[in-house]
Design a protein with these regions (language model features):
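Structured, contiguous alpha/beta core segments that scaffold functional sites
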Residues: 1-166
Length: 166
């Protein structure tokens, strides 16, 4: 007769605090909360199925005929699935918007939530930067990119890329 083993895992509460060295708000006490949750989910059939069901619930029936419309080379339904997956698994998502030379939106993509952290607040308590790194546990080997938070105003975008001064 086979024995069944169970294990109870203590899941540490997600703590967000300011890291002066990295100049980011950490995602968990050790800044690895999303990666830890992803590992736990992937090692549990039930958690993985629940994540898939919730993602499909958020997507619903999609956009009908518009499912195959491409935005920046990516199908709308695939973009929607990436957004829904990050919302279900991480309670948030990061969308990167690109502008063309006329400062009009040219395309957009979903950045992996695990790779993104929110930057420092400015004097008006506004988080204007998102920092992106492929491996926050080894930032010496993985460069950190800084992205501006989306703003649809052309004059702000021009200022962010250094075309005009404030």
């Amino acid at each position: 007769m086979a024995s069944i083993k169970t294990a109870l895992l203590e899941i540490v509460k997600k703590v967000i605090k300011w890291d002066k060295k990295l100049e980011i708000y950490t995602n968990g006490e050790d800044n690895a909360y999303p990666e830890r949750m992803e590992r736990l989910k992937n090692n549990s059939i039930t958690a993985k199925m629940a994540s898939n069901i919730m993602t499909q619930y958020l997507i619903g029936k999609g956009f009908g005929e518009l499912d195959n419309v491409k935005i920046g080379g990516v199908k709308l339904i695939d973009l929607t699935e990436d957004i829904a997956r990050d919302i279900v698994d991480n309670d948030g998502c990061f969308i990167h918007v690109n502008f063309d030379a006329n400062f009009d939106i040219s395309d957009w993509s979903v950045l992996p939530f695990n790779n993104c952290r929110i930057g420092q607040k400015d004097s008006k308590e506004y988080n204007g930067k998102i920092l992106v790194c492929n491996d926050w546990n080894d930032i010496k080997k993985n460069p950190v990119r800084t992205l501006n938070v989306f703003n649809p105003a052309k004059e702000i975008v021009m200022y962010q890329v250094g075309v005009t001064e404030n």
